[in-house]
Regions:
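Signature of N-terminal electron-transfer/Fe-S-associated modules in redox systems
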Residues: 1-65
Length: 65
């Protein structure tokens, strides 16, 4: 089980480290998967909001790969 505070803090660090990249979604998802071994469901809305994308769009990329 993920500790919510630590999880969200670490997730936001990962997102911030990739925001300046062109097309940061895949690098963020790869980093998240590297950190936790998968992309946790609670990460999807946080990533979507940070990138100004819809949750469905992020979920679609996660489920495709």
């Amino acid at each position: 089980m993920l500790d919510t505070v630590d999880f969200e803090s670490r997730l936001r660090e990962i997102i911030a480290a990739h925001l300046a990249m062109e097309g940061p979604l895949l690098p963020i998802l790869h980093a998240v998967q590297h950190e936790w071994g998968h992309v946790p469901e609670p990460a999807i809305p946080v990533i979507a909001e940070a990138l100004n994308l819809g949750r469905a769009e992020v979920h679609g990329v996660v489920s495709f790969y």
